[in-house]
C-alpha cells in the first residue's frame, strides 16, 4: 500500500497543474458566482413539491404561481453563468497583462451573454425568443461563449486592436470605444458559428451540443460512470489535491442539467431517474465531506482508546457534520495515510452505488432541488428528494454502511496510535509525509513560535494600525472558522485586526481592502497565481499547511500570533 501511494504521488504535479487550469477554474468560479440564483430557485421547488410526500398537491394555478420565480432564475441559468464565467476568466487573463492595459470584465460579461443568446435562443413567433436552451441545457454553450469572448478580448487588448480616443476624453467614454472592436469581433464570431451550425444541421449551437453529448450524459449516469466520477473526488483529495477543482467543472453541466430533468419528470408524474446531480455529490458521495467521513469523528470519539484520536474526534465532529471535514482529514490524518486509503476511496463509491440501486430498482426519485453544500448529509438527502419515505431509509442505511466500511480501519489506526502513546514514542513518518505533500515543511517551527508568542500577544503586539486579513479556502467553510478565531482573539487582546473569510475565485473585487491574505491548504497550490495578484496591490500573502491550519482555527491566540509574525 505504501508503494502504491508513492506511485500515485509521482503524478501529483500533473494533477495540480490541471487543478490550476484557468478554464476549469473559470467554470467553477462562474458557478460559485451564480449560486444565489441556484439556491433561490430551489426554495420554490421545495415549497411546490415537498407537500406531495404527504399526499397534498397544490392546484395547477398555485403550482404555476410558485414555479414562475424558478423559471425566471434557474430557467435562464446558462445566460447568467455565461457572464459570470467570462468574468472569472477575464480576471485570470488580466494577471498576465500590465495593470495599465487590462481587459474590462463588464464588457466581456456583456459580450459573452449576447453571444450566448445568439447561439441558444431562437426567435418566438409572437415576438421575443424561446428559452428552452437558456437554462441548464445551454451550459456548455455558455462556456463556449465565455471562452471565445475573453480570448478575443485578450488578443485585441494585448495587441492594441482598439479605438483610441484623445487624452482629454473622460476615461469612462474612452473605455467604451476601447471595448467596441473586441465586443464586435467576439459577438460576430459567435454569431457566425451559429449561422454555420444552423445552416448545416438545421438547429442552434446549443441544441446540437445537447444532441452530441446526450450519449455521454447517459454513460456518466451508469455504474461505471458514477464510480469513476465520485471515486476521483476522493482519490485526488487523498493525494493532496483539491478534487472538486478538477472534477466539478468537468461534470457541472451534467449535474445541474440532471436536476432540471428530474424536476420536469416529477412535474409530469414520471420517475426522476437521473443519478448524477449536485445533491448526489454533496450528500451521498461526500456525506460529511470528501471520503464520506460523516461517521468518522463519531468513531474516533466512541470506539478509539487513544487520547489523541478521541480528542481529534471531539474537535472535528461539528464541522464534519456540516461538510467541513478538514479537521479530521489533516488532524488524524486521513489523507496520505495508507490505513485509510481503501475506505476513503471505497465509501463514496459504495454510497452512490446504493443510491443508484434505490433510484433504479426501488423507484425512488432522485434529487430535484439544489441545496447549500453545508446542509448536513442526511438532511440534504431528505430535503433534496422531497421527503420520500425511501429517503429516510437511504440516509440511515448510508450511515450504517459507512460505519461498517470505516470501523476496522479506524480500529487498526487506533491500535497504532495507542501503542505509540503507551511506549511514549511518536512515529513522525506519516506526519512528515503529510507535511511534504501539503507543503508543511515549516509547520512545526511556525506553531512553536505561535505557542511562545501567544503567552503575551498583547505585550509583543507589532500591529498598531487597523489591519484587515482575508482567509481563503475552497468554498468559504474552514476559512470562516479561522476568521472567527482571529476576530475573537483580536477583540480579547485589543489588537487592531479584522478578519474576513471567502472562497478562492470569488475574492478579486474585495482583495484591495486587505493587508494580508491567508491561503488554506486546499487552495495552497494556487499560491503563485495569487501572489501575482497580491504583489500588484502590495498585499502580504501566506499559505498555511495541513495540521497547522486546523490548529490555528481552534486557537485564536495562536492564530493572532501567526498574523503578527507576518508583519515582523
Swiss-Prot record:
UniProt topology in membrane: Multi-pass membrane protein
Which GO CC terms are listed, alphabetically?
plasma membrane
Which spans of this chain does the record mark as coiled coil?
A: none
Q: Cite the PTS EIIB type-3 domain residue spans from the record.
A: 466-568
Molecular function (GO) terms for this protein are: kinase activity; protein-N(PI)-phosphohistidine-lactose phosphotransferase system transporter activity
Q: Where in the cell is it found?
A: Cell membrane
> What enzyme class is recorded for this protein?
transferase
Q: What is its EC number?
A: 2.7.1.207
Q: Which domain of life is it from?
A: Bacteria
Q: Which InterPro entries match?
A: LacE (IPR004801), PTS_EIIB-like_sf (IPR036095), PTS_EIIB_2/3 (IPR003501), PTS_EIIB_3 (IPR013012), PTS_EIIC (IPR003352), PTS_EIIC_3 (IPR004501), PTS_IIB (IPR041713), PTS_Sugar-EIIC/EIIB (IPR051088)
List the catalysed reactions: lactose(out) + N(pros)-phospho-L-histidyl-[protein] = lactose 6-phosphate(in) + L-histidyl-[protein]
GO process terms (BP):
carbohydrate derivative transport; phosphoenolpyruvate-dependent sugar phosphotransferase system
Transmembrane feature ranges: 30-50, 62-82, 103-123, 128-148, 183-203, 222-242, 283-303, 339-359, 389-409
Give one Pfam hit by family name.
PTS_EIIC
Chief localization: membrane
What's in the keyword line of the UniProt record?
A: Cell membrane, Kinase, Membrane, Phosphoprotein, Phosphotransferase system, Plasmid, Sugar transport, Transferase, Transmembrane, Transmembrane helix, Transport
List modified residues, type Phosphocysteine.
473
Which residues are in the PTS EIIC type-3 domain?
Answer: 7-409
Give the induction note.
Answer: By lactose. The operon consists of lacABCDFEGX. A second transcript of only lacF and lacE is also lactose-induced.
Q: Where is the active site?
A: 473
Q: Beyond the main fields, what else does the record say?
A: This gene was sequenced from pMG820, a laboratory-derived deletion of the naturally occurring plasmid pLP712.
Which PANTHER family does this one have?
PERMEASE IIC COMPONENT, PTHR33989
Show the domain comment: The EIIC type-3 domain forms the PTS system translocation channel and contains the specific substrate-binding site. The PTS EIIB type-3 domain is phosphorylated by phospho-EIIA on a cysteinyl residue. Then, it transfers the phosphoryl group to the sugar substrate concomitantly with the sugar uptake processed by the PTS EIIC type-3 domain.
Report the function annotation for this chain: The phosphoenolpyruvate-dependent sugar phosphotransferase system (sugar PTS), a major carbohydrate active transport system, catalyzes the phosphorylation of incoming sugar substrates concomitantly with their translocation across the cell membrane. The enzyme II LacEF PTS system is involved in lactose transport.
What is the protein name given in its UniProt record?
PTS system lactose-specific EIICB component
Amino acid at each position: 500500500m505504501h508503494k502504491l501511494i508513492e506511485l500515485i504521488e509521482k503524478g501529483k504535479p500533473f494533477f495540480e497543474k490541471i487543478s490550476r487550469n484557468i478554464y476549469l477554474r473559470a467554470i467553477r468560479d462562474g458557478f460559485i458566482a451564480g449560486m444565489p440564483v441556484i439556491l433561490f430557485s430551489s426554495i420554490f421547488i421545495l415549497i411546490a413539491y415537498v407537500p406531495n410526500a404527504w399526499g397534498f398537491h397544490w392546484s395547477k394555478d398555485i403550482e404555476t404561481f410558485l414555479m414562475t420565480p424558478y423559471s425566471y432564475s434557474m430557467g435562464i441559468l446558462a445566460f447568467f453563468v455565461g457572464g459570470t464565467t467570462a468574468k472569472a476568466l477575464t480576471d485570470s487573463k488580466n494577471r498576465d497583462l500590465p495593470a495599465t492595459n487590462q481587459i474590462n470584465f463588464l464588457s466581456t460579461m456583456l459580450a459573452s451573454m449576447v453571444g450566448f443568446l445568439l447561439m441558444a435562443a431562437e426567435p418566438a413567433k409572437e415576438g421575443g425568443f424561446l428559452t428552452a436552451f437558456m437554462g441548464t441545457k445551454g451550459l456548455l454553450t455558455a462556456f463556449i461563449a465565455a471562452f471565445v469572448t475573453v480570448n478575443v478580448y485578450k488578443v485585441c487588448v494585448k495587441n492594441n486592436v482598439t479605438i483610441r480616443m484623445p487624452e482629454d476624453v473622460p476615461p469612462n467614454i474612452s473605455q467604451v470605444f476601447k471595448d467596441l472592436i473586441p465586443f464586435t469581433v467576439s459577438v460576430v464570431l459567435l454569431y457566425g458559428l451559429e449561422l454555420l451550425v444552423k445552416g448545416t444541421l438545421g438547429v442552434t449551437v446549443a441544441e446540437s451540443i445537447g444532441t452530441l453529448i446526450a450519449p455521454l450524459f447517459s454513460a456518466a449516469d451508469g455504474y461505471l460512470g458514477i464510480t469513476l466520477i465520485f471515486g476521483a473526488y476522493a482519490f485526488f483529495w487523498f493525494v493532496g489535491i483539491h478534487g472538486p477543482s478538477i472534477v466539478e467543472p468537468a461534470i457541472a453541466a451534467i449535474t445541474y442539467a440532471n436536476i432540471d430533468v428530474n424536476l420536469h419528470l416529477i412535474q409530469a408524474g414520471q420517475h426522476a431517474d437521473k443519478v448524477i446531480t449536485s445533491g448526489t455529490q454533496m450528500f451521498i458521495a461526500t456525506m460529511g465531506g470528501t471520503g464520506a467521513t460523516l461517521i468518522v469523528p463519531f468513531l474516533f470519539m466512541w470506539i478509539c482508546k487513544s487520547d489523541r484520536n478521541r480528542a481529534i474526534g471531539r474537535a472535528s465532529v461539528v464541522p464534519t457534520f456540516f461538510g467541513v471535514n478538514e479537521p479530521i482529514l489533516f488532524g488524524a490524518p486521513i489523507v496520505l495515510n495508507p490505513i485509510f486509503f481503501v475506505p476513503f476511496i471505497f465509501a463514496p463509491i459504495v454510497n452512490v452505488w446504493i443510491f443508484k440501486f434505490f433510484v433504479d430498482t426501488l423507484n425512488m426519485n432522485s434529487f430535484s432541488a439544489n441545496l447549500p453544500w453545508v446542509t448536513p448529509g442526511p438532511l440534504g438527502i431528505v430535503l433534496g428528494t422531497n421527503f420520500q419515505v425511501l429517503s429516510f431509509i437511504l440516509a440511515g442505511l448510508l450511515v450504517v454502511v459507512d460505519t461498517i466500511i470505516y470501523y476496522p480501519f479506524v480500529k487498526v489506526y487506533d491500535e497504532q496510535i495507542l501503542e505509540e502513546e503507551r511506549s511514549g514514542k511518536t512515529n513522525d513518518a506519516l506526519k512528515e509525509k503529510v507535511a511534504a505533500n501539503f507543503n508543511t515543511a515549516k509547520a512545526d517551527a511556525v506553531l512553536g513560535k505561535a505557542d511562545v508568542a501567544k503567552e503575551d500577544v498583547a505585550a509583543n503586539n507589532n500591529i498598531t494600525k487597523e489591519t484587515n486579513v482575508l482567509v481563503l479556502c475552497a468554498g468559504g467553510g474552514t476559512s470562516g472558522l479561522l476568521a472567527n478565531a482571529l476576530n475573537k482573539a483580536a477583540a480579547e487582546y485589543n489588537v487592531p485586526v479584522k478578519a474576513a473569510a471567502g472562497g478562492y475565485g470569488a475574492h478579486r473585487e474585495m482583495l484591495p481592502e486587505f493587508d494580508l491574505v491567508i491561503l488554506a491548504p486546499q487552495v495552497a497550490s494556487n499560491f503563485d497565481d495569487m501572489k501575482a495578484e497580491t504583489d500588484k496591490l502590495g498585499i502580504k500573502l501566506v499559505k498555511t499547511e495541513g495540521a497547522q491550519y486546523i490548529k490555528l482555527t481552534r486557537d485564536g491566540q495562536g492564530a493572532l500570533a501567526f498574523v503578527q509574525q507576518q508583519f515582523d
